[in-house]
Structure formats: C-alpha cells, structure tokens
Amino acid sequence: MVRRFLKMHGLGNDFVVLDARRDPLPLTTAAARAIADRHTGVGCDQIVLLEPPRHPAADLFMRILNPDGSESGACGNATRCVASLVADGSGRAEVTVETATGLLRCRLRADGSVTVDMGPARLDWTQIPLAAAHDTLRVPAGAGPLQDACCVGMGNPHAVFFVDDAEAVDLATLGPVLEHHSLFPQRCNIEVAQVLAPDHIRMRVWERGAGITRACGSGSCATLVAAARRGLTGRAAWIELDGGRLWIEWHGDGHVLMTGPVATAFTGELSETLLPGSLPSETPLPETVPA
C-alpha cells in the first residue's frame, strides 16, 4: 500500500501531512519515527494526520505526532497549514480545525497568510500542568543560566525564559534538560526570549519530542503572553523566530490570535517500508560476510 503526502511548513517548521479522512491510517510509533527521520525517511518536525471531525462544528480533526512518536495536543504552524488546505479545497475563508485540546477557528487572509484563534492562554499551574503548586508568573524551574520560568498553557505546556541575548543560549544542551524537568509531568516546550522592543521579541525554541525547530506557533503565543504578564511588552507583538516572524495578539477575553504564512514544499508517496505494520523487523547480521 502506498500513501500520498504533502510536505508543508510554516516558517520552516515542517510537516508531513497525511489525509486519513477516508482511509484510516493508525500510525505506529515506529512508523512515525521512520517517516520523520531526516536521513532515511521524509524528514519533518511533526507528522500531521487529517481525520474525520469528532465535533459537529469542525471541518476535520488534526492529529499531531512528534518525531519520537509521542503525540502533541497543539501546533500553531501545523494548524495554519491545515486550515489553508481546507480553505483552498472548499473555497471558504473560515475553517474550524479540531485538535485533542479543542476547536481552533481559522481565517484565510487575502495575502495567503492565516490567522488562528489559538484559544485562551491557560495560566493556572494545574492547566500547564506543573507537578506542584506555583504562581506560573515565576516558576522555580531552571538549568544553568536559564532560571525563573514563566509558564503558559497553549494546548501544550510552555516554559518561557527571558534573556539578554537569545543567540548566546546553548539551547541544544539546556533544552532537553528543561524539557524533562521534574516540575513538568508531561514534559515541556522551552522558549528563550529576548525583548527587542515593546512590540518585537526574538525567540528560539526547543520543542518537546522534536528538539530545536525553526518556528513554533504555540510557543510564540506563550512567549507574547509571558512577556505581557511581566510588563515587558504590550499585548501584541512580532515574534522573530529562526524561520521568520509571526504576529501575535493577546485579547482582553484571554484568547490569543496568531497570524503567519504557510507554504507547500512538495508532494510525494510513502514507500511500504515506512507505513504502519510494514516496517522491516531487525535481522541479525550473518556470522560471516560474503567476499
């Protein structure tokens, strides 16, 4: 069996998109890892499965798998990509994407960018969640120079660390340590943020289950909320990421809106070796190698 896929990205945060609305595709953890592998698979930050909606108000259900096979409850960049696909296919400018954490209402803009209502920011420690009660404005989770996190839930957990120089942070070393910090029972996405102006933030991200990525939509939302809560910015700002920038707004009703571009890189077909149930089993090496 061969399945077609789309390779899409939002600011370089890239996805393998598989349409399973008519033909179910129960991806195994091993298959997800194989597809996401950048050397032997297609390669991506996340795999996105399009499934039939559970909620009557939704156009479809979006399932998100990380490169390690774990599931994510939210991904802002993937939501924009999926909303653009549905809008293009239906001719409608407004689309509702269902995820494991709720409904996300999206609007296709005239310039091709997409605005997503990411829902309300979750600020209570039980909603992140944390392993113990703390004021999420200042959480005693840290490693090395990264201390004093501001935690925000955006359908997935985020810990934002404000620094003087985001480029100087060794995120490849500190990211995995903080992702698995004991205060984060579901692990955590880690953002390092440098405020450049009241409406401009430089941010780098370590995503749980994926590592360093070029952009993170939900992380950008969490960063703006954290900065506004600490009085470092207003309630709307550009978030400058490795792959480009997103415009984030935190409205008075608590909802966070994200606007940014989408792109399709290419289409392709998954070979049988990458599909669930058909991954080759490990074969022992022969005792001698033929000449």
Curated annotation (Swiss-Prot):
Pathway it works in: Amino-acid biosynthesis; L-lysine biosynthesis via DAP pathway; DL-2,6-diaminopimelate from LL-2,6-diaminopimelate: step 1/1
Protein name: Diaminopimelate epimerase
Keyword Nucleus among UniProt keywords: no
Site (Could be important to modulate the pK values of the two catalytic cysteine residues) residue list: 158, 207
A Gene Ontology cellular-component term: cytosol
EC supergroup of this enzyme: isomerase
Annotated localization: Cytoplasm
